[in-house]
Structure formats: structure tokens, C-alpha cells
């Protein structure tokens, strides 16, 4: 599986903080894509497919949801989404601030991935949602 479309994103923050892997003087833009460049994102996935990837993934998933269908169409490969730490944390924070039920928010975010034709979803909420399936 290839992180074929990995954007430079602020939504990686919570994971980087916990893993103590925040860039210090290191620019990840050499391998992370600019968020606004849809064409570059799709071309990155096409290149990964040409190099032998058998599954493709967009990351962060929620902010890349518009790409899933296009990548599948261009590559004919199963394409999924990774709901990264910041996206997952935002659902938890909404719930803690009484802006919604955590499971309902999580379920909605996952249903939208499926509606966007995601073949698989990676989420930090997998254990939580599994209790409700």
C-alpha cells in the first residue's frame, strides 16, 4: 500500500507531538504535496501505481475526500483514506465541547468516506466504531 497522496498538512500535529516527530529545521515539502494542487496529487497516485503499488491511500482523508473517486478512475486501483490524528482529534474535541455525540460524529465521517467511494478507511476511531457495527 502506498501513501500515494500525502499532503503537507497541519492535521498531522497531534501525532507528531506524541511521537516527538515535529519537524525542526526540516521541510517535509520535498515529499508532501501542496494541499491546493489536485493535479499533482492525482499524478502522484498515478506514479505510485506505475511503480507497482497495489493499493493507494489519501492522507489526510477528510481534507482529501474529493480525490478518492478521481484516483480510482485514473489508476483502477483500490483507494482508501487515512483519517489522521488531527482529524480524529477534532471529532473528539467537538464532542467534549458538546457540539455532537462522539460516535455520531465518527460514524458520519466514516460514512462520508464510503460515499466518496473509499475502498478502505484507516482511523484512530476503529475500535470505538467497531462496538457499534
Kindly label every feature range from the protein language model.
Residues 1-133:
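Alpha/beta enzyme core
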Amino acid at each position: 500500500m502506498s501513501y500515494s497522496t500525502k499532503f503537507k498538512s497541519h492535521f498531522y500535529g497531534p501525532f507528531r507531538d506524541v511521537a516527538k516527530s515535529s519537524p525542526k529545521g526540516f521541510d517535509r515539502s520535498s515529499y508532501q504535496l501542496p494541499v491546493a494542487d489536485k493535479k499533482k496529487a492525482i499524478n502522484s497516485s498515478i506514479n505510485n501505481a506505475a511503480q507497482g503499488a497495489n493499493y493507494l491511500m489519501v492522507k489526510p482523508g477528510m481534507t482529501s475526500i474529493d480525490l478518492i473517486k478521481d484516483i480510482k478512475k485514473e489508476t483502477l486501483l483500490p483507494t482508501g483514506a487515512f483519517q489522521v490524528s488531527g482529524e480524529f482529534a477534532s471529532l473528539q474535541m467537538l464532542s467534549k465541547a458538546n457540539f455532537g455525540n462522539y460516535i455520531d460524529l465518527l460514524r458520519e465521517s466514516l460514512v462520508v468516506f464510503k460515499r466518496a467511494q473509499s475502498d478502505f478507511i484507516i482511523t484512530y476511531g476503529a475500535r470505538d466504531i467497531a462496538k457499534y457495527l
